[in-house]
């Protein structure tokens, strides 16, 4: 059974001082507002309302921690790209997200949610470039794949895979749909492996998704990546 089936809400964080102790394993979920991040979390956990789903962008306001048992945590980050945010709020989130994502010792990887109909937006690319210096794994979920034909889905997958292989070899990618459940089993198996649950993902899926072979996961640092700010609300 996937570790996601044990997910329960743990805590919400709006200040660095409120972060739980950095023990165990954390995987962060990030993505543009309304890309389907909350739906993906709920689908993986087989819950209807573990993460709040809204048609209104920007509803996730804090770092929401969900405990999966045995010091394993899923961390739901605020969606980026939502314009209706005051400057002071945006600056606060730049500090909070920047410090968390780049210095958190217990953070083992990030799941980056992209709408399969609109992948690799400028903010998505910014997030990839900004996170790359950590040398930590990134798995891209191309959500809402049910909105595409099979041919369209494969074309999008090929395009994103080509981009990642060239620039971010520590990344893997797959199609995903909370509606049709395409890719749910594969995503759960990969993330179970990240959590060290002993459940191994299908190796064929991982190679096709563009994950690096063992020992080849360190991406070159993009130019000026350390000087970039994380994409947050209002950008």
Swiss-Prot record:
UniProt cofactor(s): Mg(2+)
Entry keyword annotation includes Transmembrane: no
Name of the protein described by the UniProt record: Probable GTP-binding protein EngB
Biological role stated in the UniProt entry: Necessary for normal cell division and for the maintenance of normal septation.
Family: Belongs to the TRAFAC class TrmE-Era-EngA-EngB-Septin-like GTPase superfamily. EngB GTPase family.
Sites where the protein binds Mg(2+): 38, 60
Transmembrane segments: none
Source organism of the structure: Nitrosospira multiformis (strain ATCC 25196 / NCIMB 11849 / C 71)
PANTHER family (UniProt xref): ENGB-TYPE G DOMAIN-CONTAINING PROTEIN, MSS1/TRME-RELATED GTP-BINDING PROTEIN
Residue sites binding GTP per the record: 31-38, 58-62, 76-79, 143-146, 176-178
Any one GO BP annotation for this protein: division septum assembly
Keywords: Cell cycle, Cell division, GTP-binding, Magnesium, Metal-binding, Nucleotide-binding, Septation
Location of the EngB-type G domain: 23-197
Region entry Disordered, spans: 202-235
Chain intervals with Basic residues compositional bias: 226-235
GO cellular component, as recorded: cytosol
Pfam families: MMR_HSR1
Molecular function per GO: GTP binding; metal ion binding
């Amino acid at each position: 059974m996937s570790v996601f089936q044990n997910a329960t809400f743990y805590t919400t964080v709006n200040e660095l001082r409120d972060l739980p102790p950095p023990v165990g394993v954390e995987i962060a979920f990030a993505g543009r507002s309304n890309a389907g991040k909350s739906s993906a979390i709920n689908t993986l956990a087989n819950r209807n309302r573990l993460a709040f789903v809204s048609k209104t962008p920007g509803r996730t306001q804090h770092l929401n921690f969900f405990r999966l048992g045995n010091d394993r945590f899923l961390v739901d980050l605020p969606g980026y790209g939502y314009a209706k945010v005051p400057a002071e709020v945006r600056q606060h989130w730049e500090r909070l997200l920047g410090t968390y994502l780049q210095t958190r010792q217990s953070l083992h990887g990030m799941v980056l949610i992209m709408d399969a109909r609109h992948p690799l937006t400028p903010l998505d690319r910014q997030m990839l470039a900004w996170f790359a210096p950590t040398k930590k794994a990134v798995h891209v979920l191309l959500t809402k794949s049910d909105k595409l034909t099979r041919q369209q889905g494969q074309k999008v997958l090929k395009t994103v895979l080509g981009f990642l292989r060239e620039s971010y070899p520590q990344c893997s990618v797959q199609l995903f749909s909370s509606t049709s459940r395409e890719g749910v089993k594969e995503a759960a198996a990969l993330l179970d492996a990240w959590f060290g649950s002993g459940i191994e993902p299908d190796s064929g899926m991982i190679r096709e998704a563009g994950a690096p072979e063992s020992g080849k996961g360190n991406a070159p640092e993009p130019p000026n990546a350390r000087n970039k700010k994380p994409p947050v609300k209002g950008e």
